[in-house]
């Protein structure tokens, strides 16, 4: 089927390709619309043209128009409405047009989620759900999710002989926490939901571990990924050797190296000629490569030293590349790689079962609460539209209703959304009615599981002439930007993007062509500002030499100075409304960054230059003093027995105690909770402070009663009113911002109360969970985006926007590789991959599947980051400025020079694939610009033909230090007075203050070591270096055991609380005779009556386990030597820091504190005994397996105990034992080994 396009009117302002996109029909249409090509205008015009054509007999409610955001949908509806009204004004008698205007409010113009919601509300009975459901926010959904997942794991632990589950726990989690398994199930659930049938994907995930019948790695479905990676690295090694040979062949080059280098090259080239059918043959070839010793140069003065070093450097790089290939792919035998996968299959099967069960339980829980979340919408709509793998009657009705389905931003569609769209459009592409608009070069939402390959598949199969399965139209003309911006973008991306690395070729169809008209000016060259962080030695010894500034600070100062310069010089900007140039304003400038980590530094730099600044930053809210104070107060209202929040409130302006007064309160009761000390102080002391404490306790009790009677927002507002805290913070510096933050807390509490969760306790837990996860809410904004300010935002946030001047900052910031180096990897094609953990041998190593998936994820990440950079560069209308810091410009430019002699336009694949930051790409691309060649005076650079205007500035960091900034400041006092501006006053103390402010402590690592630490904390820190300990249990994430409020005491005790109870009993048991069951029951009853133990703790104690200790040989020894036994022995011991932390070289000591459960102290020796409540039975296959892990877990703690006790007592610790109550096992620890 060819194109059936009516001729374009001569008066039309549309380009030929735009006209095609507006008029094409009769088949599916894919419009590949480059940045700034007017795709929204084309889409709107296509819709309006169809609607005003009465002969087409099309109503607006017969169109489905899908956009990416609600804002886009609203704008689309507004534009269509405006177009219809204009048409109606020209033809006021048209009944058809009047009907379209009337139907517009009922038209399906929305996001796909909104369309799915419409389907569900209309056909809820087909999805078997309650029609009165409420749509919840992600925060509420995550809280329900956590509860359901915790309950699921609790159920699994309670099942007897649940060996598959326990094996999974051992394989994928730490030994004391299920946090990793919790996160893994949640991660798998989210990922599976991007597939039309999550259960099928989870089942296929298991199938990838079926390797019983696989005889070679070359048969694995992901072998092409492995092959591609090895080929890429072999070619890189080959290129390194070719560079080395080039240096050896130079005049005065190390010619004696040539024979060795050529031999190396021949060995590597032999690999490329091998058959890929035999893994063993490939392994043998890689391992047999022998890099002979390079010959010694006899007369070194005859050779250019630089050429010699460069030849050696490149040869070493080639050797390293081959070594890495052998390590990554051939470190184990082929049969072992395959057997690893087969051994993991039971765990993967169990994991798949858990994810399915969780999905089922999660949905059931939401159903019981009468709620749905956003993830449910697409799958429930799919359930309604798809029956028995075919379009349902509902779907067929939609196919009849919608004459055309139009989708914007198609490149960001996922597989579920694609399936939904396919079900509501005509089946069969040759009579398709799907109109898709997008730009795969701007597909930057893979982290949201968008699938750009959907776009690419159609782009490659659809034809421009309309023949075949669909019509493809390229819109490459850019109506947004000046030629200078387009030339820069084209110059860079012609060298970066191809199908191999970026998943798309940047060819003639993809490059940007000029479509906009701007007045001529000479200031619009693209600027590359590089700041050399290598220090420049001062010319005089007494010159001010501030400490090293962070990269972000220096770059932020450079950007602030650049903006100030542009404003002061009235940089010309073309005003499209005025149709003429005008001086630049702050609102014309935007700073783009990959992430907002540098926003605080940028804000500080802007303040110094008096530049109004707005950063759309979603962090820092909980760290603000006023919010942290309110959160602490709410924690105290919920449970006053929390020392740190209570001390924070007492010290805050709400109460206003000073350090001395806090000390007086503590002295009233030195031990126990601070709240008890507060009560004692109030009742026993006569003072102004005691009166203040009495008033506070009365007020606290009133708030506690209010928290039970009233809702959360009432409590917060009452606190604001009674304490005048809201008014107080308003009087502080930044008062407007602080008050906005407190209002935001009230608003967020109000939003929380609208969820299915209620109460202060749950709200406090909710906030704690947000803080632990890092899900900060961002400080409240008092400055709007539309004001005359310089804005800073992420590149993702800028997508779809345009700005006169764009500064792309932080180009040397490393890519985020966290997902690639994660323990577990997920992939739409190959499912799940992770390390293999041999529980018996306690060994962990990567699987072949994990290595392959890591390479695939790395390639996808590189392609995505390339597209993110494309989005950043194409936001600029007139001026593009690129900024970065480099550690040493001379060395960095030398690295770029290695590809500068390449004659091909596209940079080598390995250079692009191995990039660590945007500057790696931009530097390697721009160094082939004539201006860079002129700057470096390097004849070897092969410049590329280009119209790109490039201005390169290399600055030193010293130029942005404070004393240098002063030299650039020229303040005209009279002008300031005329403009009623303040006059800067120079202080004689400025330099001294600057010296203090820029002071940097030399022993940075020592700041992470507290002067006093408990043995338990040290055990956790050392366990981080041990892969068999739980790496997630850092102290800040550990649950703290606090006395529970009475209304919570009926709940199940935590493991820590049970452990405390058991230790308390062991301390109290009489050693005068062999204890009996009756003895212990009587003792427990006495401890309960004296409130030493709670009722819940009493019930949790297992008397049989305690008796088991005293019936053991160790227990009998303790009874026999009862007069030598000491229990609950506290100690403090100064230990040299260097003995604990090898990397910290300071002559300091750290105070170690701990408590020994029991010890038998004889004349010359001591025996240590420590009690443990770890779960053993049912969790480990046998005691031998458990004993290995327990020894790993506790050896640091016991060795520290032994070292301290030996030093204090002067006696040798000759034996140390652990007694595990669960199973009544005894484990001896060797105290002679080092840490």
Swiss-Prot record:
Heterodimer of AddA and AddB/RexB. This is ATP-dependent helicase/nuclease subunit A. Keywords: ATP-binding, DNA damage, DNA repair, DNA-binding, Exonuclease, Helicase, Hydrolase, Isomerase, Nuclease, Nucleotide-binding. InterPro entries: AddA, DNA_helicase_UvrD-like_C, DNA_helicase_UvrD/REP, P-loop_NTPase, PDDEXK-like_dom_sf, PDDEXK_AddAB-type, Restrct_endonuc-II-like, UvrD-like_ATP-bd. PROSITE patterns: UVRD_HELICASE_ATP_BIND, UVRD_HELICASE_CTER. Residues 509-800 form the UvrD-like helicase C-terminal domain. SUPFAM superfamilies: P-loop containing nucleoside triphosphate hydrolases, Restriction endonuclease-like. Transmembrane segments: none annotated. GO terms for biological process: double-strand break repair via homologous recombination. GO terms for molecular function: 3'-5' DNA helicase activity; 3'-5' exonuclease activity; ATP binding; ATP hydrolysis activity; double-stranded DNA binding. It catalyses: Couples ATP hydrolysis with the unwinding of duplex DNA by translocating in the 3'-5' direction; ATP + H2O = ADP + phosphate + H(+). Residues 12-482 form the UvrD-like helicase ATP-binding domain. Belongs to the helicase family. AddA subfamily. Its cofactor is Mg(2+). Signal peptide: none annotated.
């Amino acid at each position: 089927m060819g194109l059936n396009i009516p001729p374009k009117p001569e008066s039309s302002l549309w380009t030929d390709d735009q006209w095609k996109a507006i008029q094409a029909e009769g088949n599916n249409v894919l419009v590949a619309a480059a940045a700034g090509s007017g795709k929204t205008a084309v889409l709107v015009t296509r819709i309006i043209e169809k609607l005003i054509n009465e002969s087409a007999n099309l109503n607006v409610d017969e169109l489905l128009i899908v956009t990416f955001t609600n804002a886009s949908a609203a704008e689309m509806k507004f534009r269509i409405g405006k177009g219809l009204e204009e048409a109606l004004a020209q033809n006021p008698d048209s009944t058809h047009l009047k009907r379209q205007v009337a139907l517009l409010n009922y038209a399906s113009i929305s996001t796909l989620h909104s369309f799915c919601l419409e389907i569900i509300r209309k056909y809820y009975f087909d999805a078997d759900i309650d029609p009165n459901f409420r749509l919840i926010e992600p925060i509420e959904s995550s809280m329900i999710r956590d509860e359901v997942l915790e309950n699921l794991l609790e159920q699994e632990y309670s099942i007897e002989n649940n060996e598959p589950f326990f094996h999974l726990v051992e394989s994928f989690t730490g030994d004391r926490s299920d946090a990793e398994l919790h996160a893994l199930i949640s991660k798998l659930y989210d990922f599976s939901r991007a597939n039309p049938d999550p259960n099928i994907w989870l089942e296929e995930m298991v199938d990838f571990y079926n390797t019983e019948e696989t005889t070679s790695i070359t048969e694995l479905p992901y072998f092409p990924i492995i092959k591609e990676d090895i080929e890429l690295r072999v070619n890189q090694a080959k290129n390194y050797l070719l560079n080395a040979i080039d240096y050896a062949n130079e005049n005065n080059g190390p010619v004696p190296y040539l024979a060795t280098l050529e031999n190396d090259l021949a060995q590597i080239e032999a690999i490329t000629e091998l058959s890929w059918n035999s893994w063993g043959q490939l392994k043998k070839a890689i391992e047999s490569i022998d890099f002979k010793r390079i010959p010694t140069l006899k007369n070194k003065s005859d050779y250019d030293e630089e050429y010699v070093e460069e030849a050696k450097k490149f040869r070493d790089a080639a050797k390293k590349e081959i070594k890495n290939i052998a390590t990554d792919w051939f470190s184990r035998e082929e049969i072992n790689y395959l057997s690893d996968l087969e051994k993991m299959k039971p765990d993967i099967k169990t994991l798949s079962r858990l994810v399915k069960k969780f999905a089922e339980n999660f949905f059931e829980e939401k159903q019981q609460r009468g709620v749905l979340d956003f993830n449910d919408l697409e799958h429930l709509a799919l359930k309604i539209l798809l029956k028995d793998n075919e379009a349902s009657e509902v779907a067929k009705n939609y196919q009849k209703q919608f004459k055309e389905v139009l989708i914007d931003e198609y490149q960001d569609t996922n597989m579920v959304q694609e399936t939904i769209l396919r079900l509501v459009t005509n089946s069969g592409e040759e009579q398709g009615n799907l109109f898709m608009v997008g730009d795969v070069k701007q597909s930057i939402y893979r982290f949201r599981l968008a699938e750009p390959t959907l776009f690419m598949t159609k782009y490659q199969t659809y034809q421009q002439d309309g023949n075949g399965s669909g019509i493809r139209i390229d819109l490459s003309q850019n109506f947004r930007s000046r030629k200078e911006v387009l030339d820069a973008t084209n110059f860079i991306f012609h060298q970066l993007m191809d199908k191999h690395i970026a998943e798309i070729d940047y060819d003639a169809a993809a490059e940007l062509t000029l479509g906009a008209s701007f007045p001529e000016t000479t200031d619009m060259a693209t600027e590359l500002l590089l700041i050399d962080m290598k220090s420049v030695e001062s010319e005089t010894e007494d010159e001010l030499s501030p400490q090293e500034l962070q990269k972000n600070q220096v770059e932020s100062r450079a950007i602030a100075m650049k903006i100030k310069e542009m404003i002061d010089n009235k940089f010309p900007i073309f005003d499209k409304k005025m149709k003429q140039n005008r001086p630049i304003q702050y609102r014309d400038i935007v700073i783009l960054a990959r992430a907002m980590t540098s926003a605080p530094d940028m804000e500080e730099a802007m303040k110094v230059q008096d530049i109004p600044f707005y950063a759309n930053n979603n962090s820092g809210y909980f760290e603000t003093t006023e919010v942290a104070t309110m959160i602490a107060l709410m924690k105290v209202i919920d449970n006053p027995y929390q020392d740190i929040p209570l001390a924070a409130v007492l010290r805050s302006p709400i109460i206003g105690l000073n350090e001395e007064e806090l000390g007086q309160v503590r002295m009233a009761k030195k031990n126990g909770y601070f709240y008890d000390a507060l009560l004692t102080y109030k009742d026993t002391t006569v003072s102004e402070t005691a009166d203040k404490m009495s008033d506070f306790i009365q007020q606290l009790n009133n708030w506690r009663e209010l928290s039970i009677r009233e809702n959360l927002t009432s409590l917060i507002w009452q606190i604001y009113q009674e304490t005048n805290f809201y008014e107080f913070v308003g009087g502080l510096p930044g008062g407007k911002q602080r008050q906005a933050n407190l209002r935001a807390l009230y608003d967020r509490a109000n939003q929380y109360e609208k969820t299915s969760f209620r109460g202060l306790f749950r709200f406090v837990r909710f906030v704690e969970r947000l803080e632990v996860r890092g899900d900060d809410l961002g400080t409240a904004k008092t400055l709007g985006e539309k004001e005359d300010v310089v804005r800073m935002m992420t590149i993702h946030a800028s997508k779809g926007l345009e700005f006169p001047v764009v500064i792309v900052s932080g180009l040397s910031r490393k890519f985020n590789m966290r997902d690639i180096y994660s323990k577990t990897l997920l992939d739409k094609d190959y499912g799940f991959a992770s390390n293999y953990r041999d529980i018996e041998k306690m060994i962990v190593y990567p699987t072949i599947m994990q290595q392959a998936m890591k390479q695939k994820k790395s390639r996808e990440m590189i392609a995505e980051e390339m597209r993110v950079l494309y989005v950043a560069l194409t936001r600029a209308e007139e001026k593009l400025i690129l900024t970065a810091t480099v550690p040493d410009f001379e060395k960095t430019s030398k690295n770029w020079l290695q590809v500068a002699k390449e004659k091909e336009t596209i940079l080598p694949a390995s250079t692009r694939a191995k990039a660590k930051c945007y500057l790696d790409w931009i530097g390697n691309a721009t160094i082939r610009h004539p201006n860079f060649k002129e700057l470096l005076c390097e004849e070897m650079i092969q410049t590329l033909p280009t119209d790109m205007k490039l201005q390169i500035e290399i600055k030193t960091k010293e130029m942005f230090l404070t004393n240098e900034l002063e030299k650039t400041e020229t303040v005209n006092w009279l002008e300031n007075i005329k403009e009623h501006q303040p006059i800067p006053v120079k202080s004689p103390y400025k330099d001294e203050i600057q010296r203090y402010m820029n002071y940097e402590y030399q022993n940075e690592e020592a700041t992470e070591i507290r002067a006093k630490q408990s043995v338990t904390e040290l055990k956790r820190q050392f366990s981080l270096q041990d892969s068999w300990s739980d790496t997630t249990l850092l102290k800040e994430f550990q649950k703290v055991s606090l006395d529970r409020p009475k209304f919570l005491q009926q709940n199940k005790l935590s493991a820590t609380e049970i452990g405390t109870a058991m230790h308390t009993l062991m301390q109290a048991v009489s050693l005068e005779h062999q204890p009996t069951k009756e003895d212990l029951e009587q003792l427990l009853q006495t401890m309960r009556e004296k409130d030493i133990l709670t009722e819940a703790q009493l019930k949790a104690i297992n008397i049989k386990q305690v008796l088991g200790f005293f019936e053991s040989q160790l227990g009998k020894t303790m009874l026999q030597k009862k007069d030598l036994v000491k229990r609950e022995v506290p100690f403090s011991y100064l230990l040299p820091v260097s003995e604990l932390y090898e990397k910290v070289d300071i002559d300091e000591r750290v105070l170690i504190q701990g408590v020994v459960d029991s010890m038998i102290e004889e004349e010359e020796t001591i025996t240590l005994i420590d009690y443990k409540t770890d779960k053993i039975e049912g969790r480990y296959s046998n005691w031998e397996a458990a004993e290995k892990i327990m020894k790993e877990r506790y050896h640091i703690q016991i060795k520290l105990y032994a070292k301290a006790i030996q030093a204090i007592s002067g006696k040798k610790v000759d034996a140390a034992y652990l007694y595990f109550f669960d199973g009544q096992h005894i484990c001896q620890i060797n105290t002679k080994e080092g840490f």
